[in-house]
Amino acid sequence: MFLAQEIIRKKRNAEALSKEEIQFFVKGITDNTVSEGQIAALGMAVYFNDMNMDERIALTTSMRDSGTVLNWKSLDLDGPIIDKHSTGGVGDVISLMLGPMAAACGGYVPMISGRGLGHTGGTLDKFDAIPGYQTEPDSALFRKVVKEAGVAIIGQTGDLVPADKRFYSIRDNTATVESISLITASILSKKLAAGLDALAMDVKVGSGAFMPTYEASEELARSITAVANGAGTKTTALLTDMNQVLASCAGNAVEVKEAVDFLTGAYRNPRLYEVTMGLCAEMLQLGGIASSEAEAREKLNRVLDNGKAAEIFGRMISGLGGPADFIENTGLYLPESKIIRPVYADQTGFASAMDTRELGLAVVTLGGGRRKPGDALDYSVGLTKVCALGDEISADKPIAFIHAQTENAFAEAEAAVKKAIHVGETKPEKTPEIYRYIRESDL
């Protein structure tokens, strides 16, 4: 028998906790036998004194096991259960293409996603822009769509990882969100509860990233790779660039449109293509579908070019209650803003830097993101045709188009976009889309 206060005391004194102590505390978080004050105290003790790798693995697996852990064996699937998770960014629409692409190559992708908060967009919010799409189906429908389409992208259900829900809300209110150990456990407990064989982790770097510096992003990527592999799920983390908007747009309906254009081949933003291919190729290799990056890329390009990935995206949407002809008639179903107008820079030159976080917040001020949890969204608003770093900016070339509902909202977003996109005299050096891969062998 353990006492919560003795576990807190140990961590306060910078001692390592045993697996059994961590399991006891997490059970207490779930069944309310540990108080909010005790949870806050442990969070602060971990924030200051950290956890070693064994503690992180124990915390992650205990939280994973605090609720239902999905098991796919009864479905007799003929491929691996694979997924990807991103730390979040602006214009990060990767999941919408990557899930169908991986499924078209023979994987099964039960993707449990989140909503946007702060400056980052949420995958579920994008799907909410599609009429009829159920982001919270019952378990039977979720499993049916995963089996039949190969991919289903839905929200977290109440029976998955209840310990994280309670722990995270307390961390959010007590300034302990930024602990690498606690971030690792929060992310991975949710992902691993989906019963995955393999995971590709997209850790963003730059002005639109969750972590403030490259070093912090790399530390998180290393922690996630070590803990996930330690918990029995093959995982690689990629450090990817978020110093500019990833797609050509940011918002909800506008990003769904770009995802459909990508899958059908109407338009593929080169930066978005590189990061999507990098993550998806890693998933195929970890899942044993491809034995090399070259083979994985060849398979992925084939399912893009022959339309199979687009067809699977359509099958997932109709399977979860959306329109059966969504791919063919995307424009009929997605909402559109009253005002769609260009923004011009005040000077000419080159797009030299971007405050990506501020661009994400501009979408929030338009109504496309949340100021606080539970806020209703306007799915039609956002930014499109956002310039890329290095683009030449002239007096008649817009730096972006704003989709707004009112003149006031347009004016506010216009000022924010002009401030966030810096125009300089010299063309900036090109940054890589993917800085590095962190595999288990690199640790």
Curated annotation (Swiss-Prot):
Stored SMART domains: PYNP_C
Keyword Secreted: no
GO BP term, pick one: pyrimidine nucleobase metabolic process
Pfam families from the UniProt entry: Glycos_trans_3N, Glycos_transf_3, PYNP_C
EC number in record: 2.4.2.4
A GO term for molecular function: 1,4-alpha-oligoglucan phosphorylase activity
GO cellular component: cytosol
InterPro entries referenced in this protein's UniProt entry, alphabetically: Glycosyl_Trfase_fam3 (IPR000312), Glycosyl_Trfase_fam3_N_dom (IPR017459), Glycosyl_Trfase_fam3_N_dom_sf (IPR036320), Nuc_phospho_transferase (IPR035902), PYNP-like_C_sf (IPR036566), PYNP_C (IPR013102), Pyrmidine_PPas_bac/euk (IPR018090), Pyrmidine_PPase_CS (IPR017872)
UniProt keyword Ion transport present: no
Quaternary structure and partners: Homodimer.
Function summary: The enzymes which catalyze the reversible phosphorolysis of pyrimidine nucleosides are involved in the degradation of these compounds and in their utilization as carbon and energy sources, or in the rescue of pyrimidine bases for nucleotide synthesis.
Name of protein: Thymidine phosphorylase
Source organism per UniProt: Shewanella sediminis (strain HAW-EB3)
